[in-house]
């Protein structure tokens, strides 16, 4: 059910956003442009989806909707940049695609911090040890939002590799840091909601759904 909502929301927002951007940018029709758009769209969408999911965890909001919106903005930005670049020289292509990727990454890093962002990307790729290392660095931050994001990434990572006891042990820390979550039960429900969102992202972008540790 969650994945159905994800797909419907993403499809609808993509249709609206792509139509609006196309009016302002025009389109490139050669094969390189199409390839650039596809690659830029996919990588941007994954980053956007993960960033949206984490932003919802830290700042509040619907996780599935935030992830879908992040995927649409990230994917469309990458696809349009890739399509435009495809009509130009290789050097210009590389510069524009890199600029689009960097801008998207920096936006989410500014919201949740570089360590937490790197951690959730590693988690999506089933790199649990790397995710934990980044999460713990994030949790040391003197910026409360960054630190909270780090604890969330660690909890999600432990839950994803089916270490339920370790994941639940982090819930009191989340309750203490999060302004909106008042009980361990609320934190646990939110954790599993985010875990479902993470797995939806993996399904959508052909990443392994269940990781073997």
Task: Please provide the spans of the model-predicted regions.
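Bacterial Sec-dependent N-terminal signal peptides
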Residues: 2-13
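Short, low-complexity, glycine-enriched hydrophobic/amphipathic alpha-helices that associate
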Residues: 29-98
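Helix-termini ("caps") and immediately adjacent flexible loops/tails
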Residues: 4-5, 25-38, 83-205
